[in-house]
Amino acid sequence: SLVVINKHNIKTQDDPKLEEATTDLYSHEFYKGKMLNNTMEYAGMNVARARDEVKKNMLEQKSADIMLELIKPVKCRCGAECVVKLLSDQWFLNYSDPKWKSLAHNCINSMQLMPDEIRTEFDYTVDWLKERACARKSGLGTRLPWDTEWIIESLSDSVIYMAYYIIAKYVNDKSLHYNLNDAFFDYVLLGNGSAGDVAKSCSLSLDIVEKMRKEFQYFYPVDSRHSGRDLVPNHLTFFIFNHIAIFPESMWPRQIVVNGSVLMEGRKMSKSLGNIVPLRSAVREHSADAIRVSMLVAAELLQDADFTLDAVKGIRDRLERIYGLCKQFTKKDSTRLEQEDKWILSRLQHVVENTTNAMDRLRVRESLHNVIYTMDQDMQWYFKRIAAKERDNDSISGVVRQVLDTRVKMLSPFAPFISEEMWELLGNNKSITLASWPNVDESKFDYAADESETLIINLLADAQNIIKVTKIKPKKIFVYAAASWKWDVYRKILEMITQGKTNFGEIMKALVNDSNTSKVKESPDMVKKMIDDILSDPLDSRQRKVRLTLEEVKVFEDAKGLVGKELDSDLVIFNEDDKNKTDPKNKAKVARPYKPALYME
């Protein structure tokens, strides 16, 4: 309970978020909870299953009876309160049938569900579903063929409307008539019978019948069904049941994608709260692209997206900045690539790779975060580097143009309108909808550039932290890069850790026994720190560094202007090996690879 209270930041019993927190807690206990050891035969059982078992046992023992009760008032979409009536001789779909349930579970097991954690809810729904009314006495709908007093209830047939889409256009253009028989549907949807017999019995052209069958085979099975989480206990599970009852296994659904709802400023949209934003006015004020992106970037699939107008304005500003860059950088020519150019092009490949992987898993928020925020951060750093070296736009236009070209392609599925405009600004004559999703260019990965820029970023951050803590305003900052023998030690440790050897004693012994690294016997603390440095590094970074040799002094010299400008100080750079270095406080001795020492005065 405390975890949930902290998660929702609840301070008092009157907090309106308390109800939502309670629902979250009960839901978590119900779907994830296990029965305690003191519950006898139910011990260790899932709470959801235990509830049904307790009910079943109590009914069998005549210790309980069933009372039908509405959990809350039922209202029509027009606002009128509904009266629930029990009907006699009503028709039901028998979702209780154990064989049908078993097939439904088989279908779920063979399907891709996104996100995968929704699988538990589908299985649970299949287990508890029982007979469900499939017909009613009033309202719009199709008459039940074998009992015309009844009208087919919408959720009983609408869950296979994808199949109807195949023939809908032929109904609308009057190619089909009302004299369709069972043989027609058996052929078009199931492949039973012959096109010739169907055409003859229904007075249709052979060409139309064959065309509908081919189109059905093209579009079926359903590759992906997208809907809200609130439809898992009904529409989406009926979708599974009804498909497996009608179609062969080869035509069963392949994927279901479930999404959350959209909240407004952290609250559910409702008329009573007065927080509904009409779509037309929102688009008119903020643009369709900004609204689309702000909702998509707010949450992953199963989470509720918290829509705020401040977020929309922020997204719009970011999109307009990208648009401005597209107007500014149109030349394709690239001059000789500098260190920062190689870095931004390498970073671009990482973003393409990560975004593509995220999109393949329908991690839309993660994808947009890469394209919007990560690339913004990268470009801001790149332009800082450019400004510090006083490079003009002509010298970077080709590189920036490559970045924009790729970025706009990745942005287009989410913000199609402004992406089309930007694509044209970049000199493309055809629509961006005809452009391919960008591929990773392996030749532009530059791991030396990646690590070099990370080294500079970390140097700047370390210096800023020291200044913040000490509250000094240095006029001069001395940077000391690690001695060459320390690099030998670092590489040796890195190789051993990469091989799975992390024991300090084993590493120390290997270093002391190697003439190139034996100096470490006087510096065991440094070895411990290097081991910690390497183990705190992500695995992919370790693997890159095994193959790298960085000249730290050269890297720092290249960024001297930027770091000095950011810190408002003169930067003086030495190698620890330099006998003529200025080192009044003997700081150089603590320098380690990728961890330069600093002295300020």
Positions of PLM-derived features:
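Core structural elements
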Residues: 81, 129-137, 317-325, 341-354, ...
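A glycine-rich phosphate-binding loop feature that marks nucleotide/adenosyl-phosphate handling sites
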Residues: 69-80, 146-150, 255-262, 299, ...
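Structured, non-catalytic alpha/beta "coupling" segments that mediate domain-domain communication
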Residues: 53-95, 311-326, 409-425, 577-599
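Residue patterns forming the tRNA-binding/recognition surfaces of aminoacyl-tRNA synthetases
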Residues: 1-151, 158, 267, 278-311, ...
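Alpha-helical recognition segments enriched in aromatics with Gly/Pro capping
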Residues: 1, 123-303
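Charged, glycine/proline-rich intrinsically disordered loops and linkers
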Residues: 2-41, 176-213, 497-547
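C-terminal low-complexity, glycine/proline- and small-hydrophobic-enriched intrinsically disordered tails
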Residues: 309, 313, 430-601
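Acidic, turn-prone loop/beta-hairpin segments
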Residues: 334-356, 369, 373-462, 480
